[in-house]
């Protein structure tokens, strides 16, 4: 049964007024909030009542969600277009029960690879790994893009108070040379270790940056042997890794059953471990595993990722919401929105179902946002007074790592105030009376009042963490991962392929050839607009 069928439209006819719902039900917060260990999930400010929630939960039951959850965790090839299992969860699974994929127990493989990464991290941190000149490594430069960059970069920044290794970790992703140069300007070739993170070892941006980094290193050493002391790889293409000059002993695995946007739990998370130490990296995995268990074992009515997905899908199907705002009120989560944009939009930005049929309902939404309180002085105006329906997720941390309690209290007060303002707003009469009290006459108050009305009744969810630790961050990420999966099930789409990104890559290669040879077939096949753009560049 499709989640987005016509029966969902009538739910809007419930005409939920949040202020009224709170006034008439003093148990509303208790009913519409959940807790998982150190995470409190308050969804009471959403446009739901008992009847709507019951209807949404019934739809989840009818969607075969329970079976799909089992299939994913048991290694079924739910990525149907690429014939792959989806098992990023296996990377953080603490159980020893065999998990067979294509005839192999991947538990053993995962354990072995984790140990290899741990040994590398400890070797570099302890100083036993040395650069070509014999100096200790002081800087790590991670070269990757997409999931090989966004996840690790987000976690390294979020867990900055847990950095404990004296290693500085840098990230290079964009093919724009400025991305690479920013890192190279602050590191020393004799004390830098590069991580090349590319499953295919042919991703254009990563390969070009890696080649340039290699040239930079060899300009200093003038000896090819230096590459082995200053580069490691995470790839499945051993021949290309060896050709680059990297010792295969220092090539770490990427499995087909781990998608790039879900790969920070794998060897791709090596840069995280270099920053926070391997013990803390394991706590990150443990936090995610705790949510995996919650997701697998908890009934839907108390299952946080399921409720998250039901709410988002409900707004998409019933209110035609086309975007979702994500507002973390913690500076350490400044890359969290970027990370989730890929995880969510690359997963569920689809227009055909699993059978390949064009869907007649809305699927993925535009996920956007930024850290509070910055957003309040930028885009919150649209949230409060715009005429676009935008559900909001607030993420707040109860206690911070610093001792500036007055800052933390102000931050949290602003977060809670924003969710309250979205819910209650302020009516014309309220504004008008306030203006009169401020000294305006009746005419002036009437002229200004309409401009200050805030409609309110705009839905939001608040996720409150006790603290931002490796464990709690792992749990938070996993909540959103599973939310994305559930939405894909509800919409009957494949959340684990990303064919939409391939055409641009292909055309980019053709255009690069055309830019270098205007007699080529690639140039002759260009449209007039693209040809003119190339001409403008050449004639600059």
UniProtKB/Swiss-Prot annotation:
Its main location: cytoplasm. The active site is at residues 346, 377, 505. The keyword Cytoplasm applies. InterPro entries: G6P_Isomerase (IPR001672), G6P_Isomerase_C (IPR023096), Phosphoglucose_isomerase_CS (IPR018189), SIS_dom_sf (IPR046348), SIS_PGI_1 (IPR035476), SIS_PGI_2 (IPR035482). The keyword Ligase does not apply. It is found in: Cytoplasm. This is Glucose-6-phosphate isomerase. It comes from Francisella tularensis subsp. mediasiatica (strain FSC147).
